[in-house]
Amino acid sequence: MPAAVPSWDPSQYLRHADHRARPFADLLARVPELPRDPARIADLGCGPGNVTRLIAERWPTARITGLDNSPEMLAKAAAYAGPTAGGGRLDFAAADARTWTPAQPYDLIVSNATLQWVPGHIDRLPAWTDGLAPGGTLAFQVPGNFDSPSHRLMRELAHSARWKDRLADTLRHDDAVHTPAAYLEALTALGCAADVWETTYLHLLQGEDPVLDWVKGTGLRPVLTELGAADAEAFVAEYREALREAYPATERGTVFPFRRVFAVAHKEA
């Protein structure tokens, strides 16, 4: 049976908003000058909109559209919609990254920690680069931590005797993201000048079971959705103990290494 489409909890996701926003800021810092002013920008997989507003700070006159397929996330993002301080505009709309194709030329299409949820997303790159204006940019960031303890322990538990009948097909792994080299090859094959890199952040998290608290907002969502409240509580209890051993708390906090892969592709003018 196919896994349920994950449900999203914006409040849970935003509990680590500062840490989650850092990679997006680093991604935007590598985006070159855009070809038009005012620019037209799409944020594909905008979530609750808290980082989409950073785009308006970088390009204050831009017409920005945040796109997401989660009604819960879009409802939260609506608080940021409207005219921006620099004379631009920020709007949000429903769209699915699995099928979205630009209907008009964009100066920048950006995506932050979304494409890992899109099976076959590397095959979507041609449609997105085709949707760029001459001189435009496609920029995205994906988590590269699927072999880290936080994900490995989740998968091992999902495939254990107690849970495998319900969760064996719920979590993706090998095909969720590609290597930096694969993204570089795909983007340069499309005729783009590509800047691809990876970084491992060492997040120092505070509070009780902070790694569990983090993944409840993202990677654990398919499990929580598939199981429902009662069984999810039992799964989380087992998972919590494994995470405590893998990520021991110290007097300064809990260190959570998080690898991420970045790509910025510039289309020829």
Swiss-Prot record:
Database matches in SUPFAM superfamilies: S-adenosyl-L-methionine-dependent methyltransferases (SSF53335)
Assigned keywords, A-Z: Cytoplasm, Methyltransferase, S-adenosyl-L-methionine, Transferase
Gene Ontology biological process: antibiotic biosynthetic process; methylation
Tagged with keyword Transferase: yes
Matches recorded under InterPro entries: Methyltransf_25, SAM-dependent_MTases_sf, Trans-aconitate_MeTrfase, Trans_acon_MeTrfase_C
S-S bonds: none
Family: Belongs to the methyltransferase superfamily. Tam family.
PANTHER family for this protein: TRANS-ACONITATE 2-METHYLTRANSFERASE, TRANS-ACONITATE 2-METHYLTRANSFERASE-RELATED
Record's protein name: Trans-aconitate 2-methyltransferase
Gene coding for it: tam
